[in-house]
Every structure is written in structure tokens, then in C-alpha cells.
Amino acid sequence: MAIYWIVSYSILVFCFFELAMINQASEAKTKILINYFFLIGVFALILFAGIRGPDSGMDDSQYVGFFHDFSRQTGMTGYQAVANIYRYENFFMVLAWVASCFTHESYFFLLFISFIAVSTNAWVYKKYSPLILCSLCLYSAHLFINKDMNQIRFGLCSAFAIAFICSLVARNYLLALLFIVLSTQSHSTGYTIVMIIPFFFIRERKYLPLVLVIASIPLGIIGGKKLFLDSLGIVPVLGERAASYSGTNFDTTSPVFGLANLKNIAFIGAFTLYYFRKGIMKEDRFVYILLIAYSIGAAVRITFSDFSIFGGRVGNLFLHTEPLLFAFLMLRIRNLLLNFFMLFSITTYYLAYNTILSAQSIMGYSVAPLFRIFS
């Protein structure tokens, strides 16, 4: 597991330079250096996830086996006949078909998916984050490990979902439409991203994000599964998929006041009180929507504490806004030592959580035999 710490801490070193130059960020030389470090980090993450081998991600064997069979079956019976056999979403199946036109090697397929997922997240950070290296560092310590190193369909779904939210706030509606289609057709959880849409039409309220997450606590104590599972059927595909987990080994509970939930509540409260201490200005709308999305994720996670496979999956879709939120928060603080301490602390927390305290996504790390140059 040490390799994950090395990767994230390596990016963290570059973050110190970005934070130190926060007041000179608009200068050409500073931009060039930061972009150069950013590209190195993105390339490293793509390769790190793309060349992984056995005993890395928990779900890897599922996708390696899938592509091994799929790439050979399509050559004999055609795409449509084979696609009907599998339960995977349309866009993911199309990606598998495109990859199968060039190779039958499953580990090349993982590299292909890694390139798309990491590049999409990188595009979002490059376009919308004020501190791109800091966002990339947080992503590498948590979302990258949880999603792109394991749940690759959900990783694609989440990357497209955050791109959808950002594009919608920027009023790039055609791009937003493209991203929501790609998200829902990468993983059925993507349909839940529509929960953010009503908040585009509701007047900004300073404490609304905090109200959302606090209101979810009594629902979580009662149990979201008991209250809402039957209603999930109104969501295409997702309701059926969620119901299929009920009563299985995936149907587990998590504490309402667990470490992750308490961290989310504390972050929402602290962010609200500090970032919006003078109220929500017109230029704060983008950050406000990101915080609303984060609050929805935290609230869903708490509400469905009695059905953690659903609460965790849907919650994590919205919690994908965290690397952007932290970047905006540090930009407003503008204190080098405090910012670096915050970034170091949250990066360390996530690395410890994902590799030691709750290693649910990864088993370790190895390089696939296909990519072992020196063995």
C-alpha cells in the first residue's frame, strides 16, 4: 500500500510550489511551471492505474475477465449479440468494443479506461479549479483510489458527472447534455445526478447546504432503506439495480456518526461559515452549487447508512466536488503554512482511510505482466 502514499505525496510536493506562488499565479512563468507539473502528475496517474496488474483493485478481475471474453466473442457473433449478454451500460460497452478492435489484451483495456477517466477529471480541474495541483493531489488520495483503481465504470460515471455539473453552472448546455448522457451510460448511478438540477432554480441560501446534511441525520437513524427503497423504482435502471443488492452480502450498514460522515458534516459547516462569512456574492454561485452537490452526497450517505452500497455509491458521486471545493477554500485563505497543513492533513487522512482504516477498493498494487519491462 505504500506506493499509493508515494504517488500522492509526490504530487503534494508540487502543491507547495503552487500554494507559495498563489499571488503570482497569473504570471506566465508561474503558469507554465504549474501546468508542466500538472501534466506530469496526470500522466503518472494514468500510467499508475493503467498498468496495474493482479491484486490491485478489488473489482479488476471482473473487468479483466469481461474484456477477455467480450473481445473474442464480438469477432465471432458481432457486437449487438454479445452486448445483450452483459448487464453493463451502453457507453461502457461501446468503449469495450472500440478497444476490442485493436487488442484482445484486457490490461490494455484498463489502460484505455484509465486514460479517459483520469483525463476527464484533469480537464475539469484544469478548466475550473483555481489550484489545479491541489485538486489533483486530493483526487489522487481518494477518488482515484476508490474509483479509477477499482470501480472503473463508476469512475467514468463520476468523472462525467462532475463535468456535467461544472458545464451546467457555466451554462454550456450542449456540453452538459453530452456529459450527463455519458455519465448515465457509464454507470446507472449517474441518473441520480439530476438531484442537483432543482438547486439551479432555487435562490441561494447560505445555510442550505448545512441544513440538508443535518436534516439527513434523523432519516439515517430511522433508515433510508426502510423509508425510500420502494420509491427508487421511479429512477430508470437504478431502482432495479438497488433492489437487487437488498438481502445480499452487499446489503450492509454503516454508522450514522461514523468517521467519514462526521468529516463531511464538519467540512460543510466550516466551509459555509468561512467561505460565505460575508454572504453569497454573485461570483460565488459556482462554489455554492459545488457545495450543494457535496451536501447532497453527504446527506444521501447518511440517510442510507442502513444500505451502505447505495448510500456510499450515490453519495460518492456528489462528493466528487471535494477537490474543487478545497481549492477554492485555500485560494480564499491565502496562508501558505495553513493551506499546506490543511492539504497535507486531508491527503493523509484519505490515504490512511483508503489503505489502512477501510481498504475496501484496493488489495495492494502490482504491475501487469504485459507491462513488466525489466522482469
UniProtKB/Swiss-Prot annotation:
Entry keywords, A to Z: Cell membrane, Exopolysaccharide synthesis, Membrane, Transmembrane, Transmembrane helix, Virulence
Native organism: Erwinia amylovora
Cited InterPro entries: EpsG-like
Subcellular location: Cell membrane
Gene Ontology cellular component annotations, sorted alphabetically: plasma membrane
This protein's name: Amylovoran biosynthesis protein AmsC
Membrane topology term: Multi-pass membrane protein
GO biological process: polysaccharide biosynthetic process
Role of this protein: Involved in the biosynthesis of amylovoran which functions as a virulence factor.
Pfam families registered for this protein in UniProt: EpsG
This protein's pathway: Glycan metabolism; exopolysaccharide biosynthesis
Transmembrane segments: 2-22, 31-51, 93-113, 162-182, 208-228, 256-276, 287-307, 309-329, 337-357
Lineage: Bacteria, Pseudomonadati, Pseudomonadota, Gammaproteobacteria, Enterobacterales
Superkingdom: Bacteria
